[in-house]
Amino acid sequence: MILSRLLIRHFRNIEQADLPLADGFNFLVGPNGSGKTSILEAIYTLGHGRAFRSAQANRVIQHDENAFILHGRLSGLDEESRGYSIGLSKDREGNSTVRIDGSDGHKIAELAKLLPMQLITPEGFTLLNGGPKYRRAFIDWGCFHNEPRFFAAWSDLKRVLKQRNAALRQASSYRQLLPWDKELILLTEQISQWRAEYTEDIAKDIEETCQLFLPEFTLKVSFQRGWDKETDYAQLLERQFERDKVLSYTSLGAHKADLRIRANGTPVEDMLSRGQLKLLMCALRLAQGEYFTRKNGQRCLYLLDDFASELDANRRQLLAERLKSTQAQVFVSAITSGQVKDMLDVNSRLFSVEHGKIEVKP
């Protein structure tokens, strides 16, 4: 799908905008604080139901307004592919309305299916040097798009864990947790299997793409399921009861899974410079997007905030060429047009952004 048109109302510093978008690269150029990132956030929010800089609706709705409204037109890659009209509004209480082809009552997960995207931001280093939850999210994005049953199982896992943790505080013996643990064990084992299979499938893509961006390193990825692989999870829950009761939460399981990434046998956060980490982050997102396209026949959309940050001219060119080779729709923010001039072509569009006002440049 291609996001061919984007309408924004009362989002961040953008009062109103109606943007005709290019199928290829869309460049958003302007000084810091102009609204470039707000456009990227609007696109991200349309596909995720929340902004990437803040999950709180109050922080993205314009002052003196009750809600933001986003609308997008999705076009197929050819004349035979159907298009979609999608919309999302959210008020200050966090109530969302999702609209697809004019009808309400849809779920945000449906938007995510229609508008798959990869996000690369200066804050995205957390994928590599942040906690395991960021790398779980990376794996779960792939599982969500590859396995139709994943989202329901993942939602059930969150619910059961919350209920079990509440029961832990009251339980005097492990037997009192069995009603929750029967479901928890099934969900944990199924989700862990999906995650392991996805990681195994995408590992070659990740390692080959990383080799292109960082040829001086040998990168390896491995999945850690969240407990000792030699231990039966049912037995582990019973064995951990006293410890978990003291902690008041379930300490091991699928909710503690991680993706380990090593360069020449060393954790990447201990081996790579910031510029190299950014290249690696880009490589991971590209590999995941390209794997998704190959498996699903649908192109990913890429959002790159502050494109030039941490990258020299040669690395920017390398990234731009790889993005172009995907034939995907790409949104890039930069402070000056000079940072992206070598990437402009007949299939791209340049937007000038200043004080929340957006202008298409010839």
Swiss-Prot record:
InterPro entries, alphabetized: DNA-binding_RecF (IPR001238), DNA-binding_RecF_CS (IPR018078), P-loop_NTPase (IPR027417), RecF/RecN/SMC_N (IPR003395), RecF_2 (IPR042174)
Keyword Transferase set for record: no
Subcellular location: Cytoplasm
Residue ranges the record marks as coiled coil: none
Segments crossing the lipid bilayer: none
Pfam families: SMC_N
Keyword Flavoprotein among UniProt keywords: no
GO annotation (BP), single: DNA replication
Superkingdom to which the source organism belongs: Bacteria
Cellular component, GO annotation: cytoplasm
UniProt KW keywords: ATP-binding, Cytoplasm, DNA damage, DNA repair, DNA replication, DNA-binding, Nucleotide-binding, SOS response
Signal sequence coordinates: none
One of the record's GO molecular function terms: single-stranded DNA binding
Described purpose of this protein according to its UniProt entry: The RecF protein is involved in DNA metabolism; it is required for DNA replication and normal SOS inducibility. RecF binds preferentially to single-stranded, linear DNA. It also seems to bind ATP.
HAMAP family from the UniProt entry: RecF
Protein name: DNA replication and repair protein RecF
